Amino acid sequence: MKLLLVTLLAVLGTETAFANQGSFVDEVSFIQYLDENTALEEVKNGNLDIYYFRIPSDRIDTFEAREGLQVYESTGGSYSILINPAESEKFNPFSISEVRYAVNYLVDRKLIVNELMGGFGVPMISNYGPYDPDYLFILDEIESFHFRYNPTLAEEMITNALESAGAKKIDNTWTFQGEEIELIGFIRSDDPVRKSIGAILSSELERLGFKVKKDYGDLNKAFVVVYGSDPSDLKWNFYTEGWGGRSAFVKYDPVGLGQMYSPWFSNMPGFNDPSYWNYQNDYLDSITQRIYIGNFSSAEERIDLFRKATNEGVNESVRIFLASKIDQYVVNDKTQGVINDFGAGVPSRFTPINARTETNSLTIGVKQIYQGSWNPIMGISDTYSRQIYDTLYDPAVFKHPYTGDTFPIRSSWMVETAGPNGNLTVPEDAITWDPLSQTWQKVGPGTKSTSKVTFDLNFSNWHNGQLMDINDILYSLYFTFEWGSEPLDDDKTFDTEYTPRTAQTVQTFIGVKPIDNDTIEVYVDYWHFDEAEIADWASLWSSTPWEIMAAMEQAVVDGKVSFSRSGSVSKGVNWLSLIVPNDAAIIREYLEEFKTSNFIPPALQNFVSNTQYVNSRYDSSIKWINENDHAIISNGPFFLDRYSPEARMIVIKAFKDNTYPFPAGHWKDFENVKFPKILKIDLPTVIKKGSVLSIPVTAEDASKIHYFLTNSEGVTVATGIKELDGKNADIIISEAQTSQLGNGANDLKIFVISENVLRPDIYTTSFLAVTDSTALPETTTVGFDIQDSKNDYVGIFAIIIGAIIVGTIVYLRRKRKSTQNLRH
């Protein structure tokens, strides 16, 4: 995460076109519709403009079914199984890594995609799928596992592991020390796909001889049972997870491997709560932390780290990925301006901002209206709340919806770097927060940094009418240091989830130097081969006024609430949610107390002395809470008008303020995107080993072709990148390479990509190789043409078809590397 923290991903650039409001519509209503079929009819009838959840493919598979609708296909989400590896007084078979690994052969990924998901997905075995920019660089590592549904092999692996641990199978029932081994599966009942996945996995485990108890629930219950409990209590053994994609498309993902596989990110069983049993893996931590903080010297070294982390994460199998989703979203045909971000999909932050309707209002159906909590530190962590909250704030920088490149929104920048191996001199009067002395300290002479970023910040009014200023930025930075530093004895500025993550940011931060009211220099020990990523890492911003931050902080320090889910469970207090009236009242009480005592937070005492300014801040936020019954105050194009739990509805309204920098339509260009398309491929259905193979490819709106050729044993024999000459390129497979092909089905994957749109069109096929040219048929070349399609995601169906074809490849079980070779 960036230096900005304190407020979720801070981010965005800098233009100065002044307007009264940044959106076309005046009001957006988010209304809960649990049933997708009901929501579909409401969109057709015009009672809903958009539904922010996938629609079953069989409901919109005909022209008649789509009448009155626009259908958008989005990628980015996925399904996984989280397995509890805890050691406990009660025997837990999943504490044995071989048992966890065997689950990969117990789940039928093809069945999940083809039957449960109606073909709208792709099997996946790691956290990266075909739609992720980093996928192509680690594809051969992923392919090396060759998982397939093989319950016989799974049973063999599990039996060997359990018998070695002392378990016995009596009358087809696994026992340990005379007691039946019972597994508890927490199964999401609010998602039909995950409910079915849970039922199928439970059935497979029962068939192997385990007693399985099914515990059904939604995300709120999962926050308590799975994410909020001590894993060693064994309240759950496996959980059917679902991921809604990111809030933005990311070209160079620094977080994914750490989030999905590594303990330090506080997203693995135990969640870094010191009072709980915690999954540990120092090797994964070290690799993924290097990726996160940019501790590599080249793009090649970064890719090597990705390969190692992927290999270890899959081998450990604490989180097992099943399928990447292709979600179909429906939009009423009278609604315009939808922006289908490659990461967030239709629920991108840009869609409500850019949408246009005949009524100047927008009504969006959502699957859940409230899950988890709303606070900018460790709340807003679920898809449902993030989709709404992201429209309420502007970040400093953000990610381009189709390239994943970092671009400015509320801060422009200039980068100077000496990385990866050099350093810059930091001015002596640059400052950093010292948690021990509770003061800002000058860095002093001789201080060095790898990079320097100068930011020009584009401030506007907060929703409560107060002008953003440099104090909001400095308080955000203080908070990052205070709560991200190593905890001291009886340290109350520590959060079990937030602190370990933020500590990685803090160690790269050297100092800042405010230049004027809206310009600041940031010095970091961070390097990336893309300078925009350095700016992203160093960016300073806040989505929340400093006085709200100070009140939240004091409420947590006083033990009234917790920033995080796990902290709330372990301390027996509420998970702070600023949208809830009771929690907002706590914030108001602290603001009133601050005003009465003329309190100025220590982090601002060197910069603020004007009592009138401080009191105006307190007064404005107190007034806001009194009038709105919540404490969500931010700086984006919409403000939170009201949350009605009874009506299951949240309403946001356009922030009409002359200081807001972007006019309606500012992001309109994101509506139009040209996808790379494969138009034609000529390749033999049968080839002769030892001969040169030429494969002409024709594509449009594309710049490069990536290809991967594997033989019938699953060994990669050729891979490469070809530049397109106009629309054409020839893939040449040499004599030596074709000699390595097998007699069975050989697999070819072709990815056509564009520099401007990082969504590949993909073609996958299998062909035979023979040693005798007389065995070749008279007609050996198969050509196909793909006609132009109105469907932007023309390549997605090639992926689905390709995934089915791939299943014909002869399977070779991957030999696992020993633990000794993988550990350090």
Report each predicted region and the residues it spans.
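Append "and occasionally in soluble cytosolic enzymes with long acidic Gly/Pro-rich linkers
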Residues: S95-S203, R207, K308, N360-G365, ...
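Surface-exposed, Gly/Pro/Thr- and Asp/Glu-enriched linker/hinge segments
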Residues: A19-D26, D58-R59, A65, P93, ...
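Ligand-site clamp/hinge motif
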Residues: N20-D61, K211, P663-K689, S694-P696
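Extracytoplasmic/peripheral linker and loop segments enriched in polar/acidic and small residues
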Residues: Y101, V113-L116, K213-F223, Y252-N332, ...
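Local pocket/hinge segments that shape ligand/substrate recognition
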Residues: Q21-G22, Q32, R54-M157, T175-Q177, ...
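Long beta-strand-rich cores associated with HINT superfamily self-processing modules
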Residues: G256, V331-G372, I380-Y384, F639-R642, ...
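Periplasmic binding protein-like
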Residues: E42-K44, L48-I55, E64, R207-S266, ...
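Aromatic- and charge-enriched surface segment that lines or borders ligand/interaction sites
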Residues: A39-N47, K90-A102, L106, L424-D489
